[in-house]
Amino acid sequence: MDPTELKRVFQMFDKNGDGTITGKELSETLRSLGIYIPDKELTQMIEKIDVNGDGCVDIDEFGELYKTIMDEEDEEEEDMKEAFNVFDQNGDGFITVDELKAVLSSLGLKQGKTLDDCKKMIKKVDVDGDGRVNYKEFRQMMKGGGFNSL
């Protein structure tokens, strides 16, 4: 990230404009962006990069933290794609009722024992109403608690 971009993003986090980001400012801004990192992990991240030991993040330290957060997001996205691909057995970019049933059955889960159960599960997350779950819908469902929330 170039220095101008870094400064712009830093200022977004530095709510009171004092040149440092507190743990609270960091947590609130990440949550507003849809990134949920447990407080304990956030504290550990800050401790790792807080070179001057003041408990806050300055712009130089923020550059390191930003890189760490983006790396974690990339890793989470990769895991999400792998999970989607397990369900999308034919690789067409969609999870069908039959694919959902096959995977849930192979996992021995009571959810999805019947095609009707699977149709109901898909209907709950099928935003575009095509009877299938695309990656975006799958991702949204998983961020909302996964299959247990259905």
Curated annotation (Swiss-Prot):
Keywords: Calcium, Metal-binding, Repeat. It comes from Arabidopsis thaliana (Mouse-ear cress). Ca(2+) 1 binds at residues 14, 16, 18, 20, 25. Belongs to the calmodulin family. Ca(2+) 3 binds at residues 88, 90, 92, 99. Ca(2+) 2 binds at residues 50, 52, 54, 56, 61. Ca(2+) 4 binds at residues 126, 128, 130, 132, 137. InterPro entries: EF-hand-dom_pair, EF_Hand_1_Ca_BS, EF_hand_dom, EF_hand_pair_protein_CML-like. It comes from the Eukaryota. PROSITE patterns: EF_HAND_1, EF_HAND_2. It holds the Pfam family EF-hand_7. Residues 1-36, 37-72, 75-110, 113-148 form the EF-hand domain. SUPFAM superfamilies: EF-hand. GO terms for molecular function: calcium ion binding. This is Calmodulin-like protein 7. Potential calcium sensor.
